[in-house]
Amino acid sequence: MQPLPTVKEKAEPVPDDRWQELTDVECHTLLAERHLGRLTLTDPDGPVIFPVNYALDEGTVVVRTDPGSKLDAIAGGARVAFEVDAVDEGSRTGWSVVVRGQAAEVCEPADLDRLHGLPPYPWAPGAKARYVRIRPVSVSGRPIAMPANLPFTWWG
């Protein structure tokens, strides 16, 4: 599997020093461990987010879908964002990885045959026999760790 491109080669504190960037390897490892993410795109009504199952394939993110809003919105190679995360509210820890790139429907028969056998299989009902491929332009991530002595709300 080819690695996805990332913004940072190693973890570095950001100016606020409460946030750090995940390394290239950390981002790829976390993406490979999960199978549910959020595809963000723009349709005629504006930005929309879809929870989707996904697989990694040759350095890209692949999402199975049915004809409809996702395919309509990515026609012509739309720019999209794809986010995967994990959060433990009890410990106030977690992480988030964001992939930014171009999305297009997969149409090549050889690619479709290979992708059809990739897990995970969609949780949502429907055939989900169409595929959207996201070719990353950048991948970035950050750990989430909130000090235990801070309140859950930022305004209080």
Give the label of every model feature segment:
Residues P67-R130, P136-S138:
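Short, structured beta-strand-loop surface elements
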Residues R34-D66, F82:
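Short beta-strand segments
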Residues D45, S69-L71, A148:
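Short, surface-exposed beta-strand-loop junctions and turns on beta-sheet-rich folds
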Residues M1-P13, P51-L56, V84-E89:
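N-terminal short leaders/motifs
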Residues N53-L56, Q102, A148:
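A short, sequence-level motif marking secondary-structure junctions
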Residues M1-A32, T153:
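Extreme N-terminal tail/first-helix region
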Residues T60-V62, R133, S140:
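General beta-strand recognition
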Residues P143-G156:
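Short, charged, intrinsically disordered terminal tails
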